[in-house]
Amino acid sequence: SLFGQEFINIANGKRSYTVNVGYDYVDVRDLCTTAINCVEKGESKQNYIVGGNYIDFVGIGEVMSKKLNKQLIKGTLPFFFVYLSLPSSYLQALFFNKPRSATIDSIHTVKVQNKLIPSKLAKEILSHRPRPVDETINDTVEFFQKRGLIK
């Protein structure tokens, strides 16, 4: 995935500077448990919003830095740098026949996202309990290390 590759790039020191944006991350293990609980405990025709924990790229870099014992993120750039990356993202996709790493839609999503996804119903009815995002990041680092993708 594009995010998986960015994760690897950060861990390998290829993204020393970042724009300080983030997302609400849900560990797939927690999502699967909640999906099973939905089948068993969920109410018919009820929708459940399942959130995790918000963390930005600087926070991800800090967790990885502790895990890998090296400083990964050296600084942040202003948000407008994301817009400046659009032409190079397009050209890289064109020349290397890979998906674009940034689009105007992905930038819009980051700008207008809700950083707090409460998941109240999922927690109350489906026993949704998102694990700490640090645990997810550390487990993901180990996963990629075992495959030789993080050195």
Feature annotation, model-predicted:
Residues 1-24:
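NAD(P)-dependent short-chain dehydrogenase/reductase
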Residues 19-22, 48, 110, 124:
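Conserved short-loop catalytic and cofactor-binding motifs
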Residues 20-23, 28, 32-36, 40:
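C-terminal helical subdomain
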Residues 22-23, 99-104:
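Short coil/turn segments at secondary-structure boundaries
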Residues 25, 54, 116:
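Short aromatic/basic micro-patch
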Residues 34-101, 124-125, 132-151:
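Mid/C-terminal beta-alpha module of Rossmann-like enzyme folds, strongest
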Residues 57, 102-118:
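Active-site loop of classical SDR/Rossmann-like NAD(P)-dependent oxidoreductases
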Residues 114-118, 122, 127-132:
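Internal helix-turn-beta structural module
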